């Protein structure tokens, strides 16, 4: 009758000295793994976005949340004049990153998406270029 009580206390004492699993979130930030698929970001090369407006990312996107409009510069090179991602529709699958032939898009480790207005969830090109 006393042995089950002692065994229970043994388990309790063992767990008291273990490292806690839970993080106190606002104070302690988790470090996401390198494979974590967070917010999107456009990569920059020579002070401009690497995107060549090939339309592969909106084509492979299962949620149809990416909008691209192409433009041409003075040297007749294509670039994304308008690039938008609607984060309310995005499922963070990463297909857009895998499909990009010039490696212009990446998934960052940022995961905090809280906003008050729906417009804040539509990420335009300038906002995607800010993310490092």
UniProtKB/Swiss-Prot annotation:
Residues that bind [4Fe-4S] cluster 2: 61, 90, 93, 96
Cellular component terms per the entry's GO annotation: plasma membrane
Residues given in the record as [4Fe-4S] cluster 1 binding sites: 51, 54, 57, 100
Molecular functions per Gene Ontology: 4 iron, 4 sulfur cluster binding; iron ion binding; NADH:ubiquinone reductase (non-electrogenic) activity; quinone binding
Main location: membrane
Assembly with partners or alone: NDH-1 is composed of 14 different subunits. Subunits NuoA, H, J, K, L, M, N constitute the membrane sector of the complex.
Function: NDH-1 shuttles electrons from NADH, via FMN and iron-sulfur (Fe-S) centers, to quinones in the respiratory chain. The immediate electron acceptor for the enzyme in this species is believed to be ubiquinone. Couples the redox reaction to proton translocation (for every two electrons transferred, four hydrogen ions are translocated across the cytoplasmic membrane), and thus conserves the redox energy in a proton gradient.
Protein name per the record: NADH-quinone oxidoreductase subunit I 1
Species per Swiss-Prot/TrEMBL record: Geobacter sulfurreducens (strain ATCC 51573 / DSM 12127 / PCA)
């Amino acid at each position: 009758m006393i042995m089950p009580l002692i065994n229970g206390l043994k388990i309790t004492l063992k767990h008291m000295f273990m490292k806690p699993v839970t993080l106190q979130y606002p104070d302690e930030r988790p470090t996401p793994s390198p494979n974590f698929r967070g917010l999107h970001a456009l990569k920059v090369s020579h002070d401009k976005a690497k995107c060549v407006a090939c339309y592969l990312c909106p084509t492979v996107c299962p949620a149809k949340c990416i909008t691209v409009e192409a433009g041409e510069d003075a040297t007749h090179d294509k670039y994304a004049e308008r690039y938008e991602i609607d984060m309310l529709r995005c499922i963070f699958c990463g297909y857009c990153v895998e499909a990009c032939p010039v490696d212009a898009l990446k998934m960052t480790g940022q995961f905090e998406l809280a906003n008050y207005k729906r417009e804040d969830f539509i990420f335009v090109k300038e906002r995607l270029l800010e993310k490092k």
